[in-house]
Amino acid sequence: PRKLLDELRSEYIKKIINPMITKEAKDLVDSHRKENHKLLIITATNSYITKPIADLLGIEDLIGTDLEEVNGEFTGKVSGLPSFQEGKITRLNLWLEERGLIFEELEKTFFYSDSMNDIPLLEKGSNPVAANPDEVLEKKAIKEDWPIIYLR
């Protein structure tokens, strides 16, 4: 039942996720906030799990994979386009369009990722950063001379 799932999620966020969020990660988010940058998390992980994490970081906007719900319960299916690989770019463009923005007209963009799955998104931005990168992304970052940071 959804009520139990909600309780388990809250406990997981409190006991597991919150302690994993490092001071360095919070400081990085705050540095962008101080520059008045628009903060957005784009993740392939489902929004049900990631929204509370975005809330912990004080980030209002989140694009995640949405879960289908019927009568307040999850069906086990995805709703809409998953935000995975190229789907992240499509979802980002839709999010921007809803706000009257066009990606190519943005003056400066920062993308942080740990996964090779995000290489298309990183290549699209003006300031790609590999954060705790997997092996493939690390090699790509070195080849492209992208910054590599570690937040754990």
Where are the regions a protein language model picked out?
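C-terminal cap/substrate-recognition subdomain and adjoining C-terminal extension
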Residues: 6-10, 14-152
